Amino acid sequence: MKVKEETLKNLGDGVVLRPVDHCSSIWSMKMNMKNFLKKLHISPNQSDEAEGSISTTKSNHHKSIDVSSSSSPRSHHSNSPEIKPFSGLSNWLSSVGHRKIPSPPNSFNAKNRAATVDDTVVVNGSEHVDLGSKDPAVEEENQIQLALELSAREDPEATQIEAIKQFSLGSCAPENSPAELIAYRYWNYNCLGYDDKILDGFYDLYGVLNASSAERIPPLLDLQGTPVSDGVTWEAVLVNRSGDSNLLRLEQMALDIAAKSRSVSSSGFVNSELVRKLAILVGDYMGGPVVHPESMLRAWRSLSYSLKATLGSMVLPLGSLTIGLARHRALLFKVLCDSVGVPCRIVKGQQYTGSEDVAMNFIKADDGREYIVDLMGDPGTLIPADAAGLQIDYDESAYSASPGDNDSIHVASSSNGIESSYEENTEFRTGEHRSSTKSSGERNQSGGGGDLIVHPNISREDVKNQKKVEKAPFQNLSSRPIHSFTHMRSPSWTEGVSSPAAQRMKVKDVSQYMIDAAKENPRLAQKLHDVLLESGVVAPPNLFSEVYPQQLEATVESKNSTEAKKERGKDLETTQEGRHQNGFGPVRFLPPLPRVQSKTNAHDQRDNGKVVSQSDSSHSEASSTEYARTVPAAVAAAAVVASSMVAAAAAKSANSDSSPIELPAAAAATATAAAVVATAAAVSRQLELGSNSDGDDGSGGHEPQGSGDSNHGPNSGGERISDKSIGNESSKSDCDDVSDCEILWEEITVGERIGLGSYGEVYRGDWHGTEVAVKKFLDQDLTGEALEEFRSEVRIMKKLRHPNIVLFMGAVTRPPNLSIVTEFLPRGSLYRLIHRPNNQLDERRRLRMALDAARGMNYLHSCNPMIVHRDLKSPNLLVDKNWVVKVCDFGLSRMKHSTYLSSKSTAGTAEWMAPEVLRNEPADEKCDVYSYGVILWELFTLQQPWGKMNPMQVVGAVGFQHRRLDIPDFVDPAIADLISKCWQTDSKLRPSFAEIMASLKRLQKPVTGSNIPRPVPSSSSLPTEHEQKD
């Protein structure tokens, strides 16, 4: 039987279906549809509830939210309007072909859709059949209708697959506005990317609505219709410029700021200064800097109650919030950035920030780097995203269901979030976005929208015309943020991954110590920013495989400085590796293991030491030196620039009778981050000659041992200050190579992995019958100049010989097996020996260990050029089979990926760092003395320094609150006095290692007291332990 050629129309959808002329076709489609419905697990007589209901049904993957208790499911009387068994599904299927991605819940625009649904469908031109009936014939007609809709698609099979996927995801109707789509994405995924623009109609819903597991955001109309009540546990903020004059005024102010910012942008693009001004505008409008979180929280609650009572709605206009918490400020900042065309990303929630009620903004400044914008503690401060990657396991019980209660926990921690990324000159990765640092011209074409060229007469329309707001489509499941995986760093190379106990540490407020310090020091946030900015610099483009050649042109200065640097490499005869270059720990991101976002932080603290040069070269220009004095921190991403600046400063210093030049922190930080590209090629050649003068010191007393463990300290091998070479001798190093210390990878038998460090893995190995430790770098893509600098470091390390320095045996200098081979020390690190449960170290042995460490450090400080460790800590002191302590990780600190705030291991780095280093102030070799004082404290208290604090808290306590570890009464007074001297705030008052050695030797012979108090965890009173004989 043929079906008449007429249109079958679904009145709820308005979809016109094509006629089918043959029974066989109809029957085939009916059978296919039945199979399709079976796949969807939908029975033919199943009916849907009204889509306009606020209480939505539970789905597999999402949580539903009950907004109003007054709404209820629609009754199913025959004379009541209702959604027919398949009309809703048909509507949904018909939209699949037009929709690329999931959309918000089908509760949106429910009222409009319900009005268009009719109770009947025309069949054969005359019959009106109630779709709610149980008539099999009607059910078959419905199946035919669905099959016909599918057949109208270009690719029915692909459409079915997409339909099943979307249905399982609980997708929504296609009639939603772009603003609703973005609101749903922000609510569901907790983040909006650089491409996502906040439009009128966007609303941010926060709070616990019900315990259902379905994930459907309620429509705005339902939220606005909810009566004001103290019992409501959610809040909503609406962006609606047409009804929010305050928001319009703020946007106009932002446009005015953008117009004026052109004068401070040398490249013509919006720079970080504009971002700071926008942040200040947001902070000032929403209550100013947060000094007392409790007061801010009380003010917010008072304003919230007042607005709800005045407006008679639970939905508050964004512009009406003159007091704002972190999530409100972040939303306003994102809106203002969108209005002026500044790329901005916003994230919120536990996954990104460590708290459900905190939101943060990320921007890409004119240097191509990504920064977290502080809108709370010190509005306008930019913190590099890679330097805030602190990882903490939060106590879930600390967060209550009420948004008001949640507010009290992290009200002032918007910039202290836990989400970290590694963009820099590498690729930034989150689950939804991956960006690379590009040149200024390229950023205009990037996904983030790029920088906006601002003209003095800029207006709102100009901005809109120049940067059209694109309707952000719903991304697929890959847009869900990928959970961050941190490459764990152990205190010692031989100790493996960090202990679970440290990772289980619960912290209610990651920034509590910083907040306390801020009360005493209003400039704390800015200072902290400087510290983090220092530590988050990344290596130059040609260093890693993830970086592409075109990124080398990130700035004009970068390109020019690179050429100048090559020129100096041919002619410059001075060695200018200043102390600040020694920190060159490349803040590299995650190993090429899983390509996930890496969490790192600034471990390398580059000290602004003096640049001393004894050569007579004068090839640098005064202008370069002047640039070195004034270089802004934003240029730190171009590592090559810093090397050129250091060279220029050194050359000028050589021709001047005045005191040596101290470079600014930015130059030091840049050099530090340059992995093994710390200096120019000429410097590498000079270092070879400089090493010859002192390389044999102490060689006779060396005893073979091995250890290759430990995380290489941030500034170790780069600590050379000067070189004695002059004249034509420097050219001889051109022909020098590392062939005499190069080891072929094939000659090494690699065994089990014994450690996981900050820049690689450590394996136990055998080399020609000798037990060795093989430190294999995670970054195997060093080429050209970077590889040459690595070899230069190898040349320096091979010259060091001392009984208390870990023996360097050779290196594999050819990718893909770049490795360092050292002696193997079977007892591992001093840290592990001190803090293991059954410690058998008596006082006499610990005193000898302290003396060993002092001898090793005194040797490094006596080298010419001087070697400053800058990451001296008990995990970097290794113990051989004879209990002799040796210093390690002083030569390859530039290879470090992790930084002092990023460690999740039981021993970070901030715990041992000097306060001036934590504050990003100029530091010299005396910073090692402070670190040694902490090691002394460890040895004679047998406790872990700052064991109950995370690294960020240590930064605040030591660096800004001037706190020191408590020295127990049972510690020998002479030792206690020596520790106190090592911890002097003024580094000039700290003793040298020679003086420390003299003090310890006086204590070595007469050992008084046979009982050693033993520490008890979380107790100030320590029991005693009988002295063990050697």
UniProtKB/Swiss-Prot annotation:
Entry's EC annotation: 2.7.11.1
Family indicated by similarity: Belongs to the protein kinase superfamily. Ser/Thr protein kinase family.
Residues at the active site: D871
Amino acids binding ATP: I754, G755, L756, G757, S758, Y759, G760, E761, V762, K775
InterPro entries reported in the protein's UniProt record: EDR1/CTR1/ARMC3-like_pept-like, Kinase-like_dom_sf, Prot_kinase_dom, Protein_kinase_ATP_BS, Ser-Thr/Tyr_kinase_cat_dom, Ser/Thr_kinase_AS, Ser/Thr_Kinases-Pseudokinases, UIM_dom
Matching PROSITE patterns: PROTEIN_KINASE_ATP, PROTEIN_KINASE_DOM, PROTEIN_KINASE_ST
Signal peptide feature range: none
A molecular function GO annotation: ATP binding
A Pfam entry, by short name: PK_Tyr_Ser-Thr
Species of the source: Arabidopsis thaliana
Transmembrane region(s): none
Name of encoding gene: SIS8
Region (Disordered): 44-84, 399-474, 555-625, 689-736, 1007-1030
Amino acid composition bias (Polar residues), ranges on this chain: 44-58, 399-419, 1007-1023
Subunit structure: Interacts with UGT72E1.
Reactions mediated catalytically: L-seryl-[protein] + ATP = O-phospho-L-seryl-[protein] + ADP + H(+); L-threonyl-[protein] + ATP = O-phospho-L-threonyl-[protein] + ADP + H(+)
Biased composition (Low complexity): 613-625
Tissues expressing the protein: Expressed roots, rosette and cauline leaves, and at lower levels in flowers and siliques.
Protein name: Probable serine/threonine-protein kinase SIS8
Primary localization class, coarse: nucleus
Result of knocking out the encoding gene: No visible phenotype under normal growth conditions, but mutant plants exhibit increased tolerance to salt stress during germination. No visible phenotype under normal growth conditions, but mutant plants display a sugar-resistant seedling development phenotype.
Subcellular location: Nucleus
SMART domains, sorted: S_TKc
Keywords: ATP-binding, Kinase, Nucleotide-binding, Nucleus, Serine/threonine-protein kinase, Stress response, Transferase
UniProt-listed CDD domains: STKc_MAP3K-like
Example of a GO cellular component annotation carried by this entry: nucleus
Domain Protein kinase: 748-1003
